[in-house]
Structures are given as structure tokens and as C-alpha cells.
Amino acid sequence: MGQLSVLGFIALGGAFGACSRYLISELCVMLLGRGFPYGTLTVNVVGSFIMGLLIAAFETELMVTDPWRQIIGLGFLGALTTFSTFSMDNVLLMQQGAFFKMGLNVLLNVVLSISAAWIGFQLLMRS
């Protein structure tokens, strides 16, 4: 497969991931308000869960073709999850003096995202 094909697969997944991140973030704002970065937390936890499933699928040979790795792993999940927005959310909380919310955001993103990845991985590895 040529480099152009690889880039095309990544771009396709990235387009869906970016649109999904926007829609999930907007839904979180509608449902929960703007007082906490729920959207960023949600996309990071969901993306980590899907990545756990994806890695287990590759290890168990359920889905090992390169196009799927590129579409889902690099493209979709790369665009869905966001470390830069997570970082900026924390800078803004710090500027507002909302240190408790900032600490909670860091803790929740790290603990829930790692837990979600582990749960996703375990779900497929045990089946």
C-alpha cells in the first residue's frame, strides 16, 4: 500500500473523529453546562476505551488489517481524543483560580482514561 493510500485512510478516520469530538463536546455542554470540561473528559475516556478494544482486537487477530489500524487508531482516535485541549482546559481553570476543578480534571482524565483502556482491552482478551 502506498503512502498516499495510508494518508487517505488516516484522513478519513480523522474526519470522523474530529466531527465526533465536536458533537460529543457540544452535547456535554448542552447537558452539563460549561462549568467543567466534561466534553474533553468524555472524548478522552471514550477514546481510551475504544483504543483498549482495538489493541485487544489486534492481539487476538480479530481485526489486523492495516487500513483498519490506520482509520481507527491513527485517524479516528487521534482526532477524537485531545491532549492539547485537556492541557488548555487546565490552564484556563488555573487562570480562573479553580485549582480544585483543575486537580479534579487532571485526576479524572488520567484515572478514567487508563481504566477505560484497560477495561476495553480486558473485554476482548477474555472473550
Swiss-Prot record:
Q: Name one GO molecular function term.
A: metal ion binding
Output the Pfam families linked to this UniProt entry. CRCB
What are the protein's UniProt keywords?
Cell inner membrane, Cell membrane, Ion channel, Ion transport, Membrane, Metal-binding, Sodium, Transmembrane, Transmembrane helix, Transport
This protein's major location comes to membrane
Q: Which reaction does it catalyse?
A: fluoride(in) = fluoride(out)
Q: Membrane-crossing residues? A: 4-24, 38-58, 71-91, 104-124
Q: Which cellular component, as a GO term, is one annotated location?
A: plasma membrane
Question: What does the UniProt record say this protein does?
Answer: Fluoride-specific ion channel. Important for reducing fluoride concentration in the cell, thus reducing its toxicity.
The name this protein carries in UniProt is Fluoride-specific ion channel FluC
